[in-house]
C-alpha cells in the first residue's frame, strides 16, 4: 500500500478523519476472489463487500467491477448520481494515492477522457431527456393491438384464420411490450427512478407476465460486461449448448471438452435457440426466480397477467384452445426476441473480462443494424445497439442524434463502428456459430 502522509499536528478528530491512500495493485487484489470487494469511482475507493448484496441494481452487476475502476459504468447506469453518492459515503474507505493514474493501464486514457467530454456534450444537448409523448403513443399502440387481438376472435369466431391472426397480433404485443419494458427498466423515460420502476412493473409484469427483478438482475450484468464470459448472462449458453466467439471455443478444444457437437451448432441453433428459449426455459424459470428470491410483488404483477389473459380468452377458446394460443404466441415471440437480441452481440468479440475501458468494452461486443422505420419499430430501436450500450439511460428516440458523434469518436481512435442490414445481421449469427464450431473442432482434434 502506498504510504499514508505523515500526520500533521491538529485536533484528534482531524487525524482520525485522515484520508487513506491505495494503489491500483491493492484495489485489484480485492476483486471478490477472496472475501473483500473494492472498486474505484472518481479516484475514490469503496468497499462493497457487504453492500453488494443490497445493491438495488443487483449484487452481481456491481461485483463484476470489483477490483476495477467503475467510474464510467456508474455514470452510465444512474440517473440521480448526486443522491446515489450520498448513500455511497458509508462505503468510502479512501482514495487512490496521488501518484496513481485515474484508471488502470489496460484502459485508453485519451479515449476515456474524450468519451467523458462527449457524455457532457450529450447532456448539454438534452439528449438524455425523454419525449413523454413518444412513449405514451408507443404504449397506446401496444394496448390497441392487444384489444384488436381479442376483438378478432370475438367478432370473427375461433376458426383457423382468426385464430392465427389473433396469435400474430398477440405476439406483436408481447414483442413490442418487451421493447417498452426495456425503456422503463433502463430508467430512460422519467426523471425519477420511482416512476420508471412503476411503469416497468406494469409493462413487464401485467402486459408480459415476467418479473422486473429478474430482468434487472440479468440485463444490467449484460450491459456492465457485454460478451464477457462468466459476467454476461446472455452468453451463459457457453459452453453447455454453444461454443461462442473465437477465443473460448479454442480453449474448450484444447481442454478436450465436448458438451455438444459444436461443429454442428449452426444447425441445431434453429431447434434450441429462437423457437425454444421463451416457451421451454424463460416461461418456467421466471417463476422459480421470484419464489426462490421471495419477490412477491413481482409475482403479484405476473399473476395479474395470467388472470387477465385467462378470463378474456378462456370463454372464447376453452382450455385446449387457450393453451394452444398461449404457447403459439410464446413460440412466435421467442423467435422474434432471440433473432433481434442476438444479432448485435453473438457475431462480435466474446472473451473473458480483460478490464478495458468503457468504450472499448461496449464497441468490441456490439454492432448496429441500419436505421429504417421498420427496423426501428421491429427491434425497439435496438438496431442502435452501440449508442444504447454507451448511453443506456438515453431515451431511444435520441439514438440517431448521437450516432454521428459516436461514429466520429470511433473513427478518431481507430475503433470499428459496425452497422449492417437487418437480414445480414441475422445471417451473421449463423455464420459466426459455424466459424466458432470449426475453431473448436480444429483445436479439439489438433491442439
Curated annotation (Swiss-Prot):
A motif (Histidine box-2) lies at residues 219-223. It is an enzyme of class 1 (oxidoreductase). The modification N-acetylmethionine is found at residue 1. GO terms for molecular function: acyl-CoA (8-3)-desaturase activity; acyl-CoA 6-desaturase activity; omega-6 fatty acid desaturase activity. Residues 1-124, 181-268, 330-447 are cytoplasmic. It catalyses: (8Z,11Z,14Z)-eicosatrienoyl-CoA + 2 Fe(II)-[cytochrome b5] + O2 + 2 H(+) = (5Z,8Z,11Z,14Z)-eicosatetraenoyl-CoA + 2 Fe(III)-[cytochrome b5] + 2 H2O; (8Z,11Z,14Z,17Z)-eicosatetraenoyl-CoA + 2 Fe(II)-[cytochrome b5] + O2 + 2 H(+) = (5Z,8Z,11Z,14Z,17Z)-eicosapentaenoyl-CoA + 2 Fe(III)-[cytochrome b5] + 2 H2O; (11E)-octadecenoyl-CoA + 2 Fe(II)-[cytochrome b5] + O2 + 2 H(+) = (5Z,11E)-octadecadienoyl-CoA + 2 Fe(III)-[cytochrome b5] + 2 H2O. The chain crosses the membrane at residues 125-145, 161-180, 269-289, 309-329. It comes from the Eukaryota. InterPro entries: Cyt_B5-like_heme/steroid-bd, Cyt_B5-like_heme/steroid_sf, FA_desaturase_dom, Fatty_acid_desaturase. Residues 19-97 form the Cytochrome b5 heme-binding domain. A motif (Histidine box-3) lies at residues 385-389. It is a multi-pass membrane protein. Its main location: endoplasmic reticulum. A motif (Histidine box-1) lies at residues 182-186. Its EC number is 1.14.19.44. It is found in: Endoplasmic reticulum membrane; Mitochondrion. Disruption phenotype: Knockout mice die prematurely with no survivors past 12 weeks of age. This phenotype can be rescued by adding arachidonic acid (AA) to the diet. Belongs to the fatty acid desaturase type 1 family. The histidine box domains may contain the active site and/or be involved in metal ion binding. This is Acyl-CoA (8-3)-desaturase. The lineage of its organism: Eukaryota, Metazoa, Chordata, Craniata, Vertebrata. The gene is Fads1.
Amino acid at each position: 500500500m502506498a504510504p499514508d502522509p505523515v500526520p500533521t499536528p491538529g485536533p484528534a478528530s482531524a487525524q482520525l478523519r485522515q484520508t487513506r491512500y491505495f494503489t491500483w495493485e491493492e484495489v485489484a487484489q480485492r476483486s471478490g476472489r477472496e472475501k473483500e470487494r473494492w472498486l474505484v469511482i472518481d479516484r475514490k475507493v469503496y468497499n462493497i463487500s457487504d453492500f453488494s448484496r443490497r445493491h438495488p441494481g443487483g449484487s452481481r452487476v456491481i461485483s463484476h467491477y470489483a477490483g476495477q475502476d467503475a467510474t464510467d459504468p456508474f455514470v452510465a447506469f444512474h440517473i440521480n448520481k448526486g443522491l446515489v453518492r450520498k448513500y455511497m459515503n458509508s462505503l468510502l474507505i479512501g482514495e487512490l494515492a496521488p501518484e496513481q493514474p485515474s484508471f488502470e493501464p489496460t484502459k485508453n486514457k485519451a479515449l476515456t477522457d474524450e468519451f467523458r467530454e462527449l457524455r457532457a456534450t450529450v447532456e448539454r444537448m438534452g439528449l438524455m431527456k425523454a419525449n413523454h409523448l413518444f412513449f405514451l403513443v408507443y404504449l397506446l399502440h401496444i394496448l390497441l393491438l392487444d384489444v384488436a387481438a381479442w376483438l378478432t376472435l370475438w367478432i370473427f369466431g375461433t376458426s383457423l384464420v382468426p385464430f392465427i391472426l389473433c396469435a400474430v397480433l398477440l405476439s406483436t404485443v408481447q414483442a413490442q411490450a418487451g421493447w417498452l419494458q426495456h425503456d422503463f427498466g433502463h430508467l430512460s423515460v422519467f426523471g425519477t427512478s420511482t416512476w420508471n420502476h412503476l411503469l416497468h412493473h406494469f409493462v413487464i409484469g401485467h402486459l408480459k407476465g415476467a418479473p422486473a427483478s429478474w430482468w434487472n438482475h440479468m440485463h444490467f450484468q449484460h450491459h456492465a460486461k457485454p460478451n464477457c464470459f462468466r459476467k454476461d448472462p446472455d452468453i451463459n449458453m457457453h459452453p453447455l449448448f454453444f461454443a461462442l466467439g473465437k477465443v473460448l471455443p479454442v480453449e474448450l478444444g484444447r481442454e478436450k471438452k465436448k458438451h455438444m457437437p459444436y461443429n454442428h451448432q449452426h444447425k441445431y441453433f434453429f431447434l434450441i435457440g429462437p423457437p425454444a428459449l421463451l416457451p421451454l426455459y424463460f416461461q418456467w424459470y421466471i417463476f422459480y426466480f421470484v419464489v426462490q428470491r421471495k419477490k412477491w410483488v413481482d409475482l403479484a404483477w405476473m399473476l395479474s397477467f395470467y388472470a387477465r389473459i385467462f378470463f378474456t380468452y378462456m370463454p372464447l377458446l376453452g382450455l385446449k384452445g387457450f393453451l394452444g394460443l398461449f404457447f403459439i404466441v410464446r413460440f412466435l415471440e421467442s423467435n422474434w426476441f432471440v433473432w433481434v437480441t442476438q444479432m448485435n452481440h453473438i457475431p462480435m468479440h466474446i472473451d473473458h473480462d480483460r478490464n478495458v475501458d468503457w468504450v472499448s468494452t461496449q464497441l468490441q461486443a456490439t454492432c448496429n443494424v441500419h436505421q429504417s422505420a421498420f427496423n426501428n419499430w421491429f427491434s425497439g430501436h435496438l438496431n442502435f445497439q452501440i449508442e444504447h450500450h454507451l448511453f443506456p439511460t438515453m431515451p431511444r428516440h435520441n439514438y440517431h442524434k448521437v450516432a454521428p458523434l459516436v461514429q466520429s469518436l470511433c473513427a478518431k481512435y481507430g475503433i470499428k463502428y459496425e452497422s449492417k442490414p437487418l437480414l445480414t445481421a441475422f445471417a451473421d449469427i449463423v455464420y459466426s456459430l459455424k466459424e466458432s464450431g470449426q475453431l473448436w473442432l480444429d483445436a479439439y482434434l489438433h491442439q
